[in-house]
Design a protein with these regions (language model features):
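Short beta-strand edge/turn micro-motifs at domain boundaries
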Residues: 129-150
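Short, well-ordered alpha-helical segments enriched in acidic and aromatic residues
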Residues: 58-74
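Bacterial N-terminal signal peptides
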Residues: 12-19
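Hydrophobic pocket/interface hotspot
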Residues: 50, 62, 139
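Short, low-complexity N-terminal intrinsically disordered segments enriched in polar/charged residues
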Residues: 26-56
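Surface-exposed, charged secondary-structure patches
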Residues: 83-132
Length: 150
């Protein structure tokens, strides 16, 4: 085998190993937390805190628990749109205690790298049939700090 051929084979072997390493590095480990344990995680704590602030009508304080991007989007809304959004959020919000109860009953928090997603799915049955209510909230994680991003 000529020197240039050996170099080409070695180079392609190295490149294939490098691409495998990069692919493996891109996949962050996934952690799933369920029920009451979510309330001990920074994302669970910020979720409950923000819900309580919204329920109490403290929207400016609640907004401080969101990512910079969300805060900028909020500032970009017209006063009329912000008023409409705050009305809808307050109407759909729950007390901290009720929201914590929902998380304990059916919450699932998935952490992947510096991102998190909380999903709460509740099934309801009555004389008219059944329905499912699903709430999803996304987070950006920086160390032990968790901010709502969607």
């Amino acid at each position: 085998m000529s020197l240039s051929r050996k170099s080409a084979v070695l180079l392609s072997a190295l490149l294939s190993l490098t691409s495998l390493g990069v692919a493996g590095a891109a996949e962050a480990p996934k952690t799933e937390i369920k029920g009451a344990a979510i309330l001990d995680h920074p994302c669970g704590k910020v979720a409950v805190k923000q819900m309580g602030l919204i329920h109490a009508g403290k929207f400016e304080e609640a907004n401080k628990l969101t990512s910079k991007e969300m805060q900028e989007q909020w500032k970009g809304l017209s006063a009329k749109d912000r008023e409409m959004m705050t009305g809808m959020m307050k109407e759909m919000s729950k007390s901290e205690a009720d929201f914590a109860k929902d998380i304990k009953a059916s919450g699932v928090l998935v952490i992947e790298g510096n991102k998190g997603t909380l999903t709460i799915e509740q099934k309801h049955k009555d004389d008219n049939g059944s329905s499912t209510e699903k709430m999803t909230q996304r987070y950006t994680i920086d160390g032990d700090k968790c901010l709502i991003s969607r």
